[in-house]
Amino acid sequence: GPAGGTAAYHLAKQGRSVLVLERESLPRYKACGGGVSPAIAKWFDFDFSPVISLKVDTIRFTWKKGDPVETKIQTIEPVWMVQRDVFDHFLVKQAVSKGAELKDSTEVKSIEFKSDHWEVSTANGIFSARYLVAADGAAGPMAKWLGFKEPKRRMAAALEAPAAPGQDKSKILFEFGTIKNGYIW
């Protein structure tokens, strides 16, 4: 994801030895609204335009499909809309271009700290590292393996569908009240 790709990019850029272990084969689908703040550009020295699907400068909020509130986003650059499979893979490719190694389709099975290094066991072998970046997402096992208290989880679902034909693509739409304890974006 974006956190792992970003960490890999910056570490590899500094000349560190970086191995990215990705459970899925890249690019991989990820249900997501796809809104990215253009402010991230200042943290990178490459152009994101190849992976920006759309730039959006207006947000519209509704309650039970009525009572609309609309506002222009007051930033220099509009919000970037991206497809997560394309965006995430792009970040990892940037890391690889700086020297990181990618092993996708490589699920981590366990981690263990030995006196001065981490041992990472995967279905494809065991890897050793002095440092470990746990960027496996909110539902990943790393936090538990590292001994962090498990947060109280609430069930949630994500569904991604194409916008209706004729939909105004210059606006991000947020609908509240239609789904209990949730929203539609």
Predicted features and spans:
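N-terminal Rossmann-like FAD-binding beta1-loop-alpha1 element of flavoenzymes
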Residues: 1-20
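A conserved beta-strand/loop capping segment in the N-terminal third of enzymes
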Residues: 37-90
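A short beta-to-alpha transition loop/helix N-cap that caps and shapes the active-site region
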Residues: 27-31
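Predominantly flavin-linked oxidoreductase catalytic cores and closely associated redox partners
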Residues: 10, 14, 26, 94-185
